[in-house]
Amino acid sequence: YIEYITAPNDPDYEIGFRAYGYWGFQRSLAAQLDQNTMYSVRPGTEVIPYFMPAGVRRGNNRGPKNISYPHIFPGEDLEAFNFFEASSIRKIGNKYVTIYSGHSGPDYGLGSSNSTLRYAYGDSPLGPWKSGGVLVDSRAPVLNQDGSRLQTTNAGHNTHGSIELINGQWYVFYHRPPRGFGNARQSMVAPIHVEWDKKPVSEGGKVSIRAYDPYAKDNIWTAKDSQGNEYKGAEVTSEGFHIFGLDPYQYYSAGFACYLSDGRIQQDSWDIWDNHAPITNVKNGNIIGYKYFGFGGLNKDKLGLKAFEGTKKGNKTAFNLFLAPKTSKTFKVNVWLDGPWNNETWKGTKIGEIVVPANSAQETTQFTIDVSKFVDHLDKKHAIYLVAESQETGDLFDLAGLGFSSNKKKIVRPVVPKVNIEVNGKAIEVPETPVRSTESNGITGYDIYEAVYKLPAGTTGIPTVSASATDKSVKVEIIQATSVS
């Protein structure tokens, strides 16, 4: 972190800044850096060996027994910090905030996980710090069916990130792991409400970070169960920067889903040209949710977002689901608005059902139902939930995506072109995944695919390579071989 110096009486005024480094895995360390090297410890200072308390869960501090933490405010609960790794420092008003990957969950009634960001605040880049609590839990905590407890609705592994003010709105950036796979990290962003006062932390000043909802009371979203457990971190949604809701009249892949009753069904994709991450092997009772669709539209450009038209009477809005059946039996997908249950906790409304006939082709197919009665008068933003229903116990379908259409706006599922490569007129296998990065190949992107063709023994003629694509707009360039060696 760079602390810029503007006070003439500061000893570093002539240099203009102070630099700090923060590091550590399951142990927090920090140091002031030499401004001349920007990597070594500043002369006259030392590495802080135990900067913030690290832990797995409350009551399990990883630090040595009887260690002191001079960079934590006296009286703070050392077990509330739970540092894991990945510090990021921001200045907010007259205070400093450190964001880090930490263990959370028991503080709001869930199991402990480092799939969360936490924060602390202080008067300097080196504290001393007071714990602010959880910033975001990528496991997507929400109420269970009857509101008696909180539950997770996404898989967990770990997360890293920070916060930033953009166009007057604060956001938290983090990542979540499809099906809990730590090497598949889906980038996420959510709006937050940041509040601070002018008092120094040493005199009782605070920084508070809560989930932001432009349509909620006081613009604050929260999830609190009937036992009093409350998750105050950012809400995990499908929106990204579109905090007034997604434009309903577009296609959204299964990768946008943010509520999964079974976190194992979310897959990932190596294809950088395909904004697609399928949900597979959906079974009876599985719930898939998207939060939120901006049925009320956005009447003018705001916060860097372009205005869009929502639903309205006369649109004859239809709901479109793109799925591939995996059974020869019939099954249903129930479509719910606001919640997957019609009870006091969720207040959901079933707006239709998609019936997939027996013996349907096991390929991605578009199914459409009229939902205009339920959505063409809505304002603000609302969630959509899919609930699978069948007498079968096995896999029912794979979900590709969904979206709404109207009598004026059609929906088209984007399909990435398929490339066919032939050698001497014989098709060869094109791999589904790109070349992986290794220490020897130096490849850092995911845009190179390698297909191999082994010449038959005794081949003397130079082979001819041809290629084509299902989309004529794909440009094909071939450099033919000049020899067989």
Can you say where each PLM-predicted feature lies in the sequence?
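Carbohydrate-active catalytic/glycan-binding domains of CAZyme proteins
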Residues: 1-355, 359-411
